[in-house]
């Protein structure tokens, strides 16, 4: 089972079909429009386990969470929902002993009405699972996570995900607060990107105070705000006006020029970030150029998606960008994600692993 943004089930299904085929796991996706989830039915027993072990979760763009389904209950009796789940899981010899329980729903308005029930149900369900030896007596982040996903009252999927190959967040969504002094809500996109793409223990080194960043298409400064908050200096490139609160920090230089033509005068930039409303292929190529020229070491940028053929567009743009870097002998690490705070767009992170002198 995979969670995704409502309206992106088709893209999520296309992606899991492709990835499963690459691992020689065969099946078909069950897709319900605007449901916020996709169920991939494997033809052979044991293949769901094969997928959650062998398919790198971080390589999935449109999935927020991934877990192997052990059972589906379509009509749990309201007077006792716990016993049928315990009975079914006890039959599964391969079901792992779990260290955490998440009782969730897909991210739709209808399903989220069940969240209050999910919270109340968690404590008795956890106690019952521990009593049966299906969960460890103490929470353990190094053990599998047991998921119970309610898609409607009495209708749920039960399964598990593996630590290190799942989303660490409940429902696959990081809980971020909008900072009152940020100039726009887009600030949460970049903050979420840092959480998703950069391991927390590397923040001090890779998002260090005193670094220089460039923000293309910066105004009014939602993304710049995240860099300034981390005590970086920023070249803000936009013909529009920047928020006064950011200008007053003394940490930013505002360049009123076209983002596609800007070149930093001093080549001491670590980060390039970009959230421009432009053709995705054009933005992806521009980011490749910045890394190839050694103008930046890491990039986070958004690609706006077309109305139709979104998955194909994403595959094409990413493939072209990878080929451009490979042909120019640039070593890199690339990850793409349809973030919770993204709408008709995806966010890409590239870390350049080659030591390139700026030119």
Swiss-Prot record:
Enzyme class: transferase
Active site residues according to the UniProt entry: 304 (proton acceptor)
Keyword Methyltransferase among UniProt keywords: yes
Its EC number(s): 2.1.1.186
Record localization: Cytoplasm
Reactions listed under catalytic activity: cytidine(2498) in 23S rRNA + S-adenosyl-L-methionine = 2'-O-methylcytidine(2498) in 23S rRNA + S-adenosyl-L-homocysteine + H(+)
InterPro entries, A to Z: RlmM_FDX, RlmM_THUMP-like, RNA_MeTrfase_FtsJ_dom, rRNA_MeTrfase_M, SAM-dependent_MTases_sf
Stored Gene3D superfamilies: 3.30.2300.20, 3.30.70.2810, Vaccinia Virus protein VP39 (3.40.50.150)
Keywords for the protein's UniProt record, in alphabetical order: Cytoplasm, Methyltransferase, rRNA processing, S-adenosyl-L-methionine, Transferase
Main location: cytoplasm
Function: Catalyzes the 2'-O-methylation at nucleotide C2498 in 23S rRNA.
Subunit structure: Monomer.
Family designation: Belongs to the class I-like SAM-binding methyltransferase superfamily. RNA methyltransferase RlmE family. RlmM subfamily.
Protein name stated in the entry: Ribosomal RNA large subunit methyltransferase M
Gene from which the chain derives: rlmM
